[in-house]
């Protein structure tokens, strides 16, 4: 008999709506013993079967659902089915947009909670973010090896969130050959170098692909400031869009060096690109104090908020940095501003931008809205999957 997680009375509603998480407060008791990440059955207070998921005793998310089908076992065949289903959509996108790199698995939205897989050419970069994902590592890797024999697999599960579920961070080659120090990929006509082994996340922010492309329509003959530039994807896109100058700012010299290489790789005019190692908040104030002006500003900061207790502070941070950006824009200038914090709703982010404009003494029009690229889908029953939001704003 399998181990069962029994829900408290009335706490089954979210599962009946096929939400993939069971929170600790919804649990009445466990029947049997399960190890960290082990597969368990989830039942209501009367014992009616609801779902099958991965158990995590130390997490507020006590179980993550693998399947709502009682006949489905969690094994190699299960992971193969999920991977093949996800690949169909990515195949269409890759062909339509000419991509050689994309997010293959987007966690819960692809029916594989806690699992992220990005494909860069013939390298699969794996992140296992939950106890259940780690428990199923061998089955997942076996399915990947069968379906993608041409691909090497590299583990980038060096993510702090693993510690919340009692797991160590892991990093390194799983199968195949080691990725090169910098792997070239293609995106909307750009060639970009990706550092799989040491870069942010899995090496590159694939979720901003469509936003980078959209930037081109605003930048012709314009002076652009690219904040939190990382390896320069927005900068390269701005140069391809015909900007007169782009200034990229980041605290990492390594990232700025790759950004410079990306400009050179695309045979763009390096004299139009400036790379500044500095703190963005500090530099924006310096620019304001000396009267610098820009026509377009890209504001793509890292996540400011990890949990609800940090939300108020994050709101202040987002408001301050966008206020400074608005002050630096010429009349009619464009602010492209983003938040990748899942707890930051689109409505709240829009209000923060409005408040920033008031504090800056400027009027702002919202002219375009952004979200994560289409290879990062959001399943209807899991709205938390929509984490990236952004706006194009015209400053009056």
Swiss-Prot record:
Catalytic class of the enzyme: transferase
InterPro entries linked: PUA (IPR002478), PUA-like_sf (IPR015947), PUA_sf (IPR036974), RLMI (IPR023542), RlmI-like_PUA (IPR041532), SAM-dep_methyl-trfase (IPR019614), SAM-dependent_MTases_sf (IPR029063)
Organism (species): Shigella boydii serotype 4 (strain Sb227)
EC number of the protein: 2.1.1.191
Coiled coil: none
The protein, known as: Ribosomal RNA large subunit methyltransferase I
GO terms under cellular component: cytoplasm
Pfam (any one): Methyltrans_SAM
SMART domains noted in UniProt: PUA (SM00359)
Keywords carried by this UniProt record: Cytoplasm, Methyltransferase, RNA-binding, rRNA processing, S-adenosyl-L-methionine, Transferase
Encoding gene (name): rlmI
Role noted for this protein: Specifically methylates the cytosine at position 1962 (m5C1962) of 23S rRNA.
Lineage: Bacteria, Pseudomonadati, Pseudomonadota, Gammaproteobacteria, Enterobacterales
Domain PUA: residue ranges: 2-81
């Amino acid at each position: 008999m399998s181990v069962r997680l029994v829900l408290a009375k009335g706490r089954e509603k979210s599962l009946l709506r096929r939400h993939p998480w069971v929170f600790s407060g919804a649990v009445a008791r466990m029947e049997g013993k399960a190890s960290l990440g082990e597969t368990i059955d989830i039942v209501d207070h009367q014992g009616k079967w609801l779902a099958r998921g991965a158990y995590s005793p130390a997490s507020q998310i006590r179980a993550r659902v693998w399947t709502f089908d009682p006949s489905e076992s969690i094994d190699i065949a299960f992971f193969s089915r999920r991977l093949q289903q996800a690949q169909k959509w990515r195949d269409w996108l890759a062909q339509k947009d000419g991509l050689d790199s994309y997010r293959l698995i987007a966690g819960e939205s692809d029916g594989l909670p806690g699992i992220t897989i990005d494909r860069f050419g013939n390298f699969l970069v794996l992140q296992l973010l939950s106890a259940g994902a780690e428990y199923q590592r061998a089955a997942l890797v076996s399915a990947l090896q069968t379906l993608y024999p041409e691909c090497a697999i590299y583990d980038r599960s060096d993510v702090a969130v693993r510690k919340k579920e009692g797991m160590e961070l892991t990093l390194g080659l799983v199968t195949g050959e080691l990725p090169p120090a910098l792997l070239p990929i293609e995106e909307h006509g750009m060639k970009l170098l990706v550092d799989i082994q040491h870069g942010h996340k899995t090496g590159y922010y694939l979720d901003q692909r469509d936003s980078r492309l959209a930037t081109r329509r605003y930048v012709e003959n314009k002076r652009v400031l690219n904040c939190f530039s990382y390896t320069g994807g927005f900068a390269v896109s701005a140069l391809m869009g015909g900007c007169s100058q782009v200034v990229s700012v980041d605290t990492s010299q390594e990232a700025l060096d790759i950004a410079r290489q990306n400009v050179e790789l695309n045979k763009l005019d390096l004299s139009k690109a400036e790379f500044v190692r500095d703190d963005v908040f500090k530099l924006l104030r310096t620019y304001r104090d000396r009267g610098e002006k820009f026509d377009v500003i890209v504001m793509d900061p890292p996540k400011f908020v990890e949990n609800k207790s940090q939300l108020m502070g994050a709101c202040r941070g987002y408001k301050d940095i966008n206020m400074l950006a608005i002050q630096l824009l010429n009349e009619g200038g464009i602010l492209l501003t983003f938040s990748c914090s899942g707890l930051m709703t689109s409505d709240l982010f829009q209000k923060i931008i409005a408040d920033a404009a008031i504090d800056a003494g400027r009027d702002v029009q919202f002219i375009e809205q952004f979200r994560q690229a289409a290879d990062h889908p959001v399943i209807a029953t899991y709205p938390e999957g929509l984490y990236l939001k952004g706006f194009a704003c015209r400053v009056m």
